[in-house]
Amino acid sequence: MFNIGINGSMYVGALYAGWAGYRFTDLGHYSHVTLCIAIGMFVGAAWMLLPALLRVYAGVSEIISTIILNFVAVLFVSYMANGPFRADPIAPATPRILETAELKQIFPNSQFNTGFFIAVFVAILAHFVLNKTTFGYELRSGGDGLVGMYPSRFSSYLGIPSDRSAIIGMLLSGALGGLAGAIEVLGAVRYFFQELEFNQGFDGILI
């Protein structure tokens, strides 16, 4: 499977991580940051549920559906930043997140923050899970088994439910996109605004 919708997951993950960053006011630093990241990952994963189900059960190309959802995500977060979550009467933006929700800066006057170490840790963990565990093998087999319009029988011959593995894989990739968006808001810009742009999802395809 090819998930081209990471940008969409990043947008919605960033929006709701930013929302959680100012909405919850009675939390300590680590609790608040953890909650914001968890919400961003959950929303990012949920954003990928529809294209995953369409791919597995209806044979709809996940490339087409996730690209479309990228545009839907841009329109959705634009509406939310201009409407329900808007705080600034001049600029379409959410309120600034609370200090308890901020990822700490490594260097003064720099956007380099502890989110970098979170990203490195998650990348190492993902590599280990995908290549060194049974769960990771099932994920790779399930994704590779989606050939043509419908899942091939290769995975089922191995006793691996390819449809379930494919859905879980899409949700996990969406969660990682939501994590990336959350780190951007919590560690760099400190609030969500309409003009915030994410191109890292497409950059990740090349990497």
Regions flagged by a language model, labelled:
Residues 5, 28-34, 103-115, 194:
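Interfacial loop-to-helix junctions that mark the boundaries of transmembrane helices
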